[in-house]
Amino acid sequence: MAVTAAQVKELREKTGAGIMDAKRALVETDGNMEAAAELLREKGIAKAAKKADRVAAEGLTGIAVNGNVAALVELNSETDFVAKNDQFVALVKETAELLAASKPANNEEALAIKTASGVTLEQELVQATATIGEKITFRRFVVIEKTDAQHFGAYQHNGGKIGVISVIEGADETLAKQVSMHIAAMNPTVLSADELDSEFVKAELAQMNHKIDEDNASRVLVNKPELPHHEYGSKSQLTEEVLAAAKASFEEELKAEGKPEKIWDKILPGKMAKFIVDNTKVDQQFALLAQLYIMDDSKTVEAFLESKGAKAIAFTRFEVGEGIEKAETDFAAEVEAAKAGL
């Protein structure tokens, strides 16, 4: 039977299929709109299944705030080109809004959420895989709740490649967003240094000192003084005994320099503060509150917030593709393979 342009247009609007796919489906189903739509869905699932073993490591983060609930999600695509596709961008936005509204507990519950079109989120992702032409993956999400006295800091960087939600108490949304900007830039992994495992601290400290050794090897070649190792890496290692020993050492230095004892109390606090900064480098790398605030690096994030009567409660930071092993592609080999398949 003859298929009209109006029928093709209607089917495309309903399914998102391409012109030729829509026309073929209508021809195969004798113009039955519902049957054609079902046929396209079936073909879409089949196409999506073929793409299931591809690595999807590009994509976007999405953020949605719904009153005292916020959601952060990461959807992946295979290429950065598709990540900028309007349909993909809209899908990420819709997914974040659904998560904030439904507050699912895990990925299984999230994928079972009904979308505005009546299908589940999982089905919508399958359809998107078919129509966009790349594997679309729902990777991870978090739902964060706050009280009326707290504020969300929602921030996305680099077009959504990094997404951050923070919860700040005793501040306003502007300050909360600034903290999230800091988190996006400095990539802390925990809120407080108290959350860092002692073995982790030891391993990271060893890695830092190894890097110093490498730097010193280069410095020697150009007659620069060698940098000292960090003896400690976290405030958890700075016991009362360690701090007392450091203070005693500084007192000996001041005495040897001939500094009058009556002015020591003015000098020692600065030396002790520097000692703590120099020996909490692991904390500063991984713990938000211990990091120097990027908008005022004379203070840690914790000290800056305290100066504003505020307190950081929680945060989550997603960076697209982190932890996903990307396949190495050989463009020339792909071209030859494509030629062979012609």
Swiss-Prot record:
CDD domains: UBA_EF-Ts (cd14275). It is found in: Cytoplasm. Belongs to the EF-Ts family. This is Elongation factor Ts. Its main location: cytoplasm. Gene3D superfamilies: 1.10.286.20, DNA helicase RuvA subunit, C-terminal domain, Elongation factor Ts, dimerisation domain. It comes from the Bacteria. Residues 79-82 are annotated as: Involved in Mg(2+) ion dislocation from EF-Tu. InterPro entries: EF-Ts_dimer_sf, Transl_elong_EFTs/EF1B, Transl_elong_EFTs/EF1B_dimer, Transl_elong_Ts_CS, UBA-like_sf. Keywords: Cytoplasm, Elongation factor, Protein biosynthesis. The keyword Ribonucleoprotein does not apply.
